């Protein structure tokens, strides 16, 4: 067997778009687990070490001596070892179908004390003959689409513990909730004691949402239509999004209801320490927050004695995490807030966390085009149209949520505003680091929320 340890991991990993160590100096990368799936295919877990003492573990499926699809040959080629070339197997013509067959047969593969378990969901049908291609979407994982039947998400940066995306999709699918793509199968590396808490989730297969449109694309198209019709109100424009926002509110409420029914609810204190810690760390990096910090802190502190109902939620909900099929809205990617520890991503929270995420996303959809045009501070008419669009869709979403659940988010206005503020503070930190030109969007919202 060719030794994957001989491949140039330290050179190849930083070139991948799912690599999470860009702000750290990589000091070394080598395989810690190697499990042969067949003679020319290895499952490899690579440990990447950084100068700050941190470590990430990445999953790479290595196919040997099999040329990848030509258009991907550069990104897929890892390197040579023992006169053979190793490729990222997900870009191979045939390897993804083989991986799907392992899930279909609930196969087990083991080597050197490591055991990889593949599992199919009850009554699931996997498209074993379908053609596969890698999605070109920017992701922290890699998704392989099998015709219009299934999507295979391979986790790249992996960790032990119960994966919330698998967990919640399984719960919602088995409960028959219509607003998720059904889970078809999974695979994982068994933990030391064989329990789910110590296992290493590695990937999942769900139904593919055929003929679906992303919520973000639909919303921004609606905004462009509104901007193009300067003499019409939002409800008069052909691309009005309010009806879809209402239905999205219904879908989110339905998902929340199923999660509450199956996994339960409890009472907890408002997470004042967490939001204050985020505010403090972000304000230290974003000087523009300074003038608002005291007011935000005061708003959070007022909720310190508040008892809230918490349950499992999506955790990172926005318009890029929802798909509109011909039948309904689907919620996808239940992994929680990126970069947070697993235990925090699985922690119960208020459903208002998800509501606030969608409301914040409306702001981005409306004001994003102004930022891209550089006119957010100069074109007062377009800014007013953007505000009109935001308010119309906020109202529609909350109306839909209230109609489906019997709970109106606006009845908890101070708590909802606090979750919106917390999200906007997070956005300010993100934009300051990655897209300074977009910083005015969260700052505008923070100014509005603190003035209310």
Swiss-Prot record:
Keywords: ATP-binding, Carbohydrate metabolism, Glycogen biosynthesis, Glycogen metabolism, Kinase, Nucleotide-binding, Transferase
Xref: Pfam families: Mak_N_cap
Keyword Protein transport attributed: no
Catalysed transformations (reactions): D-maltose + ATP = alpha-maltose 1-phosphate + ADP + H(+)
Gene Ontology biological process terms in this record: carbohydrate phosphorylation; glycogen biosynthetic process; trehalose biosynthetic process
Domain of life: Bacteria
Pathway(s) per entry: Glycan biosynthesis; glycogen biosynthesis
EC numbers for this chain: 2.7.1.175
Gene Ontology molecular functions: ATP binding; kinase activity
Family membership: Belongs to the aminoglycoside phosphotransferase family.
Role, per record: Catalyzes the ATP-dependent phosphorylation of maltose to maltose 1-phosphate. Is involved in a branched alpha-glucan biosynthetic pathway from trehalose, together with TreS, GlgE and GlgB.
Summary of subunit composition and partner proteins: Monomer.
Protein name (database record): Maltokinase
Source species of the chain: Mycobacterium avium (strain 104)
Gene this chain is encoded by: mak
């Amino acid at each position: 067997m060719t030794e994957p340890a001989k491949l140039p991991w330290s050179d190849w990993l930083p070139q991948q778009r799912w690599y999470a160590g860009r702000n750290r100096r990589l000091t070394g990368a080598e395989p810690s687990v190697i499990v042969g799936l067949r003679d020319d295919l290895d499952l490899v877990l690579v440990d990447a070490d950084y100068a700050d003492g941190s470590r990430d573990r990445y999953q790479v499926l290595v196919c040997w001596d099999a040329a990848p699809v030509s258009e991907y040959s550069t990104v897929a080629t890892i390197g040579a070892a023992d006169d053979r070339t190793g490729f990222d197997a997900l870009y191979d013509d045939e390897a993804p179908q083989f991986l799907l067959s392992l899930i279909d047969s609930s196969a087990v593969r083991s080597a050197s004390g490591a055991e990889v378990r593949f599992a199919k969901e009850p009554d699931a049908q996997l498209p074993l003959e379908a053609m596969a291609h890698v999605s070109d979407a920017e992701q922290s994982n890699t998704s392989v689409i099998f015709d219009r039947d299934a999507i295979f998400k391979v986790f790249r940066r992996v960790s032990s513990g119960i994966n919330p995306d698998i967990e919640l999709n399984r719960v919602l699918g088995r409960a028959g909730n219509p607003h998720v793509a059904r889970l078809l199968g999974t695979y994982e590396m068994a933990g030391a004691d064989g329990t789910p808490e110590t296992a290493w989730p590695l990937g999942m297969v769900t139904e593919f949402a055929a003929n679906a449109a992303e919520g973000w694309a639909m919303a921004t198209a609606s905004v462009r239509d509104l901007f193009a019709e300067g003499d019409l109100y939002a409800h008069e424009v052909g691309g009005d999004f309010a009806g879809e926002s209402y239905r999205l509110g219904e879908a989110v409420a339905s998902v929340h209801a199923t999660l509450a029914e199956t996994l339960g609810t409890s009472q907890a204190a408002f997470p004042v320490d967490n939001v204050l810690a985020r505010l403090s760390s972000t304000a230290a990096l974003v000087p523009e927050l300074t003038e608002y910090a005291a007011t935000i802190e005061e708003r959070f502190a007022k909720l310190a004695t508040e008892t809230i109902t918490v349950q499992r939620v999506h955790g990172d909900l926005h318009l890029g995490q929802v798909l509109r099929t011909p039948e309904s809205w689907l919620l996808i990617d239940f992994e929680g807030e990126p970069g947070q520890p697993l235990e925090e991503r699985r922690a119960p929270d208020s459903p208002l966390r998800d509501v606030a995420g969608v409301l914040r996303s409306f702001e981005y959809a409306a004001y994003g085009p102004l930022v891209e045009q550089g006119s957010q501070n100069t074109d007062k008419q377009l800014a007013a149209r953007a505000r009109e669009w935001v308010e119309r869709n906020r109202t529609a979403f909350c109306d839909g949520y209230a109609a489906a659940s019997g709970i109106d988010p606006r009845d908890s206005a101070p708590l909802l505003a606090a979750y919106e503020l917390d999200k906007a503070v997070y956005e300010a930190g993100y934009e300051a680091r990655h897209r300074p030109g977009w910083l005015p969007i969260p700052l505008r919202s923070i100014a509005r929320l603190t003035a209310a």
